A protein has these predicted regions:
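Short, T/G/N/S-enriched strand-turn elements that build extracellular solenoid repeat scaffolds
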Residues: 1-177, 183-195, 203-205
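Ser/Thr/Gly/Pro-rich low-complexity, disordered linker/stalk segments of secreted
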Residues: 178-181, 187-233
Length: 235
């Protein structure tokens, strides 16, 4: 797709689909489209790429800084890869969840990545700032994400959060189970952590601004993303 304003509807793409750089900041809409390969997004702006009833067999690769991917209807994405800061949101008709969301930036950026769609699994592989405004079953922060910040918004729940790098956890959401393998992790006092564990001799996270409500004991009940719920409002 090379032109802004393009709508692709009721089609099956046998290979990869590329939204080209020539789209610029323009709009592109995919409606009732099945892509057997991957979708590579190189064009589009802050309010421009819409997936409505889209199914992708491979990955959706977001390679344009500042692009906004908006999900609608029964869109089903098993894997989304973020290569540059962007935003992923949903409207009230989207009732699913991303299978896997992998954040691995091609270059370091101070700009925030905004995730407003539920996901079964999230992997943060590089240093960046992430605002999480939807539930996640499991989230892993890799050692290469040293210095990253994860802002878990109010009303958002992360089931299992494992951390292998010195990062900052902020926000006022809920983490059911937190496990750290390095010392130096900080947790905002407004964030609720039900259970905290350490591995490899790491020190427990330090808390600022009050109590996180955490506990080193108790049992963990896995969180399951239930589709069909209403969209989480922006905070």
């Amino acid at each position: 797709i090379e032109k802004a304003g393009t709508t692709l509807e009721n089609e099956t793409v046998l290979g990869d689909l590329v939204i080209a750089e020539s789209v610029g900041e323009g709009n592109v809409t995919l409606k009732n489209v099945t892509v057997l390969g991957s979708v590579i997004v190189k064009g589009g702006g802050a309010n421009s790429v819409y997936f409505d009833g889209v199914r992708v067999g491979g990955a959706v690769r977001l390679e344009k800084e500042g692009v906004h991917l908006r999900l609608r209807g029964d869109t089903a994405l098993e894997r989304v890869e973020i290569g540059l800061p962007c935003r992923i949101t949903r409207d009230s008709t989207f009732e699913g969840a991303l299978g896997a969301l992998v954040i691995d930036l091609a270059k370091e950026s101070a700009k925030e990545i905004q995730i407003e769609v539920p996901a079964k699994r999230v992997e943060l592989l590089s240093r960046t700032n992430v605002a999480l405004n939807a539930d996640v079953e499991t989230l892993r922060i890799d050692r290469d994400a040293e210095g990253a910040q994860l802002d878990i918004k109010r009303g958002v729940m992360v089931g299992e959060l494992s951390i292998d790098a010195r990062v900052a956890l902020t926000g006022s959401g809920l983490v059911v189970s937190l496990v750290v393998s390095v010392s130096g992790v900080t947790v905002s006092g407004s964030l609720t952590v039900e259970k905290t564990g350490t591995e490899g001799g790491a020190k427990a996270p330090t808390t600022s601004g009050g109590s996180s409500g955490g506990s080193s004991g108790g049992s963990y009940v896995p969180v399951k993303i239930v589709t069909g719920a209403a969209a989480v409002p922006d905070v």
